[in-house]
Amino acid sequence: MVREDIRNIAIIAHVDHGKTTLVDQMLKQGGVYHENQQTVDRVMDSGAIERERGITILAKNTAVHYGKTKINIVDTPGHADFGGEVERVLKMVDGVLLLVDSFEGPMPQTRFVLKKALELMLKVLIVINKIDRPDARCEEVVGEILDLLIDLEADESTIENPILYVSARKGTATLDLDTPGTDLRPLFDAILKYIPAPEGDPDGPAQVLISTIDYSEYVGRIGVGRITRGVFKAGMNVVHTNVQTGVTSQPWRLGNLYQYDGLKRVDAEEVRMGDIVALSGAADLSIGDTVCAPECIEGLPFVKISEPTVTMTFQVNDSPFAGREGTYVTSRHLRARLMRELQTDVSLRVSDTDSTDAFEVCGRGELHLSILIENMRRQGYEFAVSKPRVIYREIDGVKCEPIERLVVDTPQASAGAVIEKIGRRRGTLEHMSGQDRVRLEFLVPSRGLFGYRSEFMTDTRGEGIMSAVFERYEPVKGDIPHRSVGALVAHESGVSTPYALFYAQERGTLFIGAQQNVYEGMIVGQNSRPDDLVVNVCKQKHVTNMRNASASEDAMRLISVHPMTLEECLEFIDDDELLEITPKNLRMRKRILNAGDRARQWRYKQD
């Protein structure tokens, strides 16, 4: 049986192509907000980091009513590092809106998520956004999307579906570029016409596949999924089972049932086939579990989540400043927090190491792990992490490494430098197009991209756009240069002085300013030469009774201090270095703090 009063859709798009803004407008025009109600932009990006960076990390659910139809909307992450979120969420919907920027066109992440949607046989509706951009190239972008659909072997009905042209900022949609839209009605109508209604047995034994897990201080774990069969009622007895593990729970009583209405989660006494529901009552409910009636225990297969490609070591901070700034500093705290993350992030892997104070954490990419680090830091955790490393695999007896598809959009003048740098990092140019702005497509090892983003922004004078997505594993490509410059390393512990920094800046770029606490072995800057250099940044100017206006500390000006962001620190550190993370500071340091001990270690390795 088909439920015509409901549609379940996901919006898939590349980072910053405007999907959260489009959802805002759909909510406004669907009557979720009262007239004259004050609203914030990008309501779906509810996390602090999401608002700051303008990216969606966790998939969100909302619902809007159009006529007599309820449209459940899932806003998904656009970055492949959060692909674990995307893959799970697609199991809850019957169709997707493919949202593409009218200038940038389809990007690697668009391809990644679209491929997953087509594998699940979901209906696709193409939406070109930002048609009011002065540099919009709608017709060319439509051609690129159709090429992509053909390349991914989409069926004819998808390719022949009408294309919608939207300005999410203005809240307008049209089927014809020559006829400007006035509201989003054409989009809503297309959703009802081309996205199929949920289908299933409304009278069979109740069954729902849990796709995401939420947590509430009041009711504990909340499982979210789409009901594939039957009816759930608050207080009824159910069990949960898992196809992969084969484990089935004892019967338990359903606690609260919730449905989505606008931006709110509202209590429901009864939910039926086709509804997206949130339910509580089991403390051990996990992603991939099927909640069903005890008289018909039947697990549903769960989507295969892509394996991690990048690993880092998270360890207890053992620097001289350990414990000063963090609330949670012990290995017990660190372990508990990582295990808690595993409950909601299916793409993450955490394992023990030889040391009780260190854990191996594997994720889908640098961004995936850096968001986890930033979240932990804001929650009061203090710890240290190693340089990101790729995860190698042995395939048919051959050591293989992850290869990424890199798409670069850059001014013509910078294209040569980009091609040369990627070539040095073992990348191969696959495709090149464009005149004033050049679009380059490479296949490059994941480790070749570590540390490249800041170099890329320098080469393109901040005008370049780069985006990469995991493609496949291939035999190891050989050595790749990591860092062409050395580090300026603090000689002693103390407080940095303007006098010492004034002379240290001649050696390279400083990362710290005056009056900052430093310790021996801490990295305070970037050397202009390839080797590390030990510098004294705590040196005081000797007081004499001679006047020397030119050497006055007042006349000493620091040329430039470059405070490092989390991503820049992760790109910069080498194998023999760590990044110390506290709620207040990021400090890069040598693993071996004493310069003499480092020299002895180096000589030992040479022998």
What are these regions (language model features)?
Residues 123, 133-193:
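Canonical P-loop GTPase G-domain recognition
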